[in-house]
């Protein structure tokens, strides 16, 4: 199995956390792995740390971008440099469980028809303490145990439940699947993984692995939080929702309009909350995006329908339940 999996780690700063992430790879229970660190133009202290850690282990390779490309452009460039058959993504603020590589190698050999594996993970806070696992709670609704999905079978799941991976950490794919599916949208910052999953799920069998193989950190400095503050997520999420709603494979699913409106109501909620800060012009643009993605009327009704649920979970880390089947 030597040379089966390369762990790909995109890095941009966060020196204190990236050292822990690299240590979690080096502490794997099996020795036959590769780690490819893609430094996306980090600050000098982080660059120096990465060079020191890479020089300490021959299994670690380091590439450095002369300028910051952004997460998905950096990943596109990095995945093109992977030479092993499989690649596993690990974000620089997350951790692999010690048995992760061993577990994934076993799954690869037991399910050879699956070229994409999405694994559960444990959710931790900034200090590393376990917290409520929102993504696992959602996954319980459609895959309470590990199971295989045929090509195209995940498309309704991706519309009803959203970006089911929840995070790119733990995403394991065959290199040739990435080549056939095409790159992530490098001009996107929030929903590029969701959009890419649509294309990948059309082409390959997918294994949903419910054994956690990583610890994913939730903290205020994440890119997703930055995108939400300045509303960049609206355009991308509305586009993905519309893509799924109008997908030919879902034409016979009348629920698709209701599911699309459920996701769009989050955008409407955020747009209304941001209105005093961003003004009418920016809010009107968000409303237009929502209308194109799911229909403003349907979305407003969906928002009203979930308001009682919002009040019940206010102040907690519990999520809204997914839309009905």
Can you say where each PLM-predicted feature lies in the sequence?
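C-terminal subregions of glycosyltransferases and related glycan-biosynthesis enzymes
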Residues: 159-161, 194-195, 202, 218-325
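Short aromatic/hydrophobic "clamp" motif used to bind/position activated sugar donors
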Residues: 87
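Glycine-rich, basic loop-to-helix element that forms the pyrophosphate-binding segment
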Residues: 65-82, 95
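Conserved nucleotide-sugar donor-binding catalytic segment
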Residues: 7, 138-237
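Acidic helix N-cap motif at the loop->helix transition within catalytic regions
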Residues: 44-52, 95, 99
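A conserved acidic beta->alpha catalytic loop
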Residues: 31, 39-48, 67, 91
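Short, acidic, metal-binding catalytic loop of nucleotide-sugar glycosyltransferases
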Residues: 23-32
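Conserved donor NDP-sugar-binding/catalytic core segment of glycosyltransferases
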Residues: 99-138
